[in-house]
Amino acid sequence: MGRGKIEIKRIENSSNRQVTYSKRRNGIMKKAKEITVLCDAHVSLVIFASSGKMHEYCSPSTTLIDILDRYHKQSGKRLWDAKHENLNNELDRIKKENDSMQIELRHLKGEDISSLHHKELMAIEDALEIGLASVRNKQMEFYKMVKKNQRILEEENKHLNYIVHHQGMPMEAGNVREVESGYHQRAVRDYNPQMPFAFRVQPIQPNLQERI
């Protein structure tokens, strides 16, 4: 006599259900491996037990992502919602932008330019000239800042030397002010000959009142 037909329905006993799941799962995994080898098929299998534990198999010649992409293209079904699609598109855009920037960087370094047209080479030259001008401007700003700091340090050094030169004098509060005042007067005197003639103080003419 043949074996009777088994009714397919949920197994109520949890222990029996777990044993049956384990046997059937191993059988499905075995069949998936066999059809992969015998028929050169691409198979991806994912099984979740009632406990939440996952078991999976994928043909060695492919990946789950590749199979899902092929399914999406051939079936026309949407596997992702609009939010995920927007994120995927944004990732693609960023990747393309990054690739383009990498190419531009190689061109600016003089790499891979043999196949470029004249206009493309001119654009690279313009970009390099703009960058060089920016670097030179920064260098000039730095140079001016260094010269300014140098002048300040030289002035402070002169001030300190003047005070040290007069250190034999009693350094009371009044004398310190006199020393500093003498330094400033000397600085004005040293600077005065360098002033243009038109800005120098002219002596008062003694006979001016008599002429009036």
Curated annotation (Swiss-Prot):
InterPro entries: MADS-box/MEF2_TF, MEF2-like_N, TF_Kbox, TF_MADSbox, TF_MADSbox_sf. It is found in: Nucleus. GO terms for molecular function: DNA-binding transcription factor activity, RNA polymerase II-specific; protein dimerization activity; RNA polymerase II cis-regulatory region sequence-specific DNA binding. Residues 84-170 form the K-box domain. Keywords: DNA-binding, Flowering, Nucleus, Transcription, Transcription regulation. Residues 1-61 form the MADS-box domain. The keyword Cell inner membrane does not apply. PANTHER family: SERUM RESPONSE FACTOR HOMOLOG. This is Agamous-like MADS-box protein MADS9. It comes from Vitis vinifera (Grape).
